[in-house]
Amino acid sequence: MRCLLLALIFISLWALFSELRAESSTACPVTTQVESTAIARAWHDDVINRRNPTKLSDIVGPEVVHHAAGGYPKIMNAEGIAAMMGDFLAAFPDLLITFDQFIAKDDFVVERYTASGTHQGPLGDLQPTNRTATWTGINIFRVACGRIVEVWSEVDAEGRRRQLILPLTTPGR
């Protein structure tokens, strides 16, 4: 009787374990730090540098939240992010992002970058100045299931604006 009881307990535990394994295999795969960094890099490299805005839908999750700085709404979804990137590409058609540093830890990737471009289209209330500006920024991405699900952005918008609106100075004057 004792053996039968132990066998039933074993079979029950085995069935439960098998069920849990099946559930975990249908959950999203774990994203490695290397994969997360590549996904974060695509945010600027594919969408901005390669002028491929459709790539955004491949790298952000359906419920992505972007905590933005620099004059945009504080929280944006995928449509808001696409509109923001479109605004920047219209304002700076030659916009180029260079990557200064990536740091990955767990499901977070920090990107430090430098951007530069010639201001040829409206940007918020600022009309085109045809001046070139260079500014820096930092993004913190949270990546889950191979997609960006949350972003915190800080950008030197004030430094960019100063470069675009202040009178040009000539050295020695």
Regions from the PLM with identified roles:
Residues L5, E19-R173:
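C-terminal and inter-domain tail/linker signature
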